[in-house]
Amino acid sequence: LEKFTIDEYPPKLLIINSKTGKSIPAKNPEIVLVDKHFREGKLLKWRIRVRQNLPLAAPVVTSDTVKYVGWGSSGAVTALLVEAQPMEGDRAVGKPLVGWVTCGSYLFPFQELKLTKDLSLVMARREPERYASRIHVYTRSQKNIVATVEVNKPVSVDGWRIYQLSY
């Protein structure tokens, strides 16, 4: 194995009940997909804007807050600096709330934006889009074959099929 990669779908934002952790609505939650073109969307009665999108980030604790900075290492998280504005129809009501939202990783905890005492804006776990392994296959005939194996795209070498089953 030379290199393994996981490509992920863009982050999804949703609103949950802070006390139960259940999405709202529970059976079929509303989501906002934050792809590279996303600037603004609506979730329930909240206008959501992304002020900053850091695909690979780590938290930095300052004297009074936690902010995120670019960090291209293992355990990095996708961090979104979001603004959530309560709305009544097309009219803004109240003050916008601003904060970082992440889904967390094995290294860093998730970060939510508290909207009310009962509601929080959260990022769902990132879903894998593609797994790929760049491999070297050494044959009995002294060949070194370099290939990329993906799920449902096996590599055939000397009558053998090499599969990528998952990560």
Labelled PLM ranges:
Residues 1-167:
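Solvent-exposed, non-transmembrane regions of integral membrane proteins
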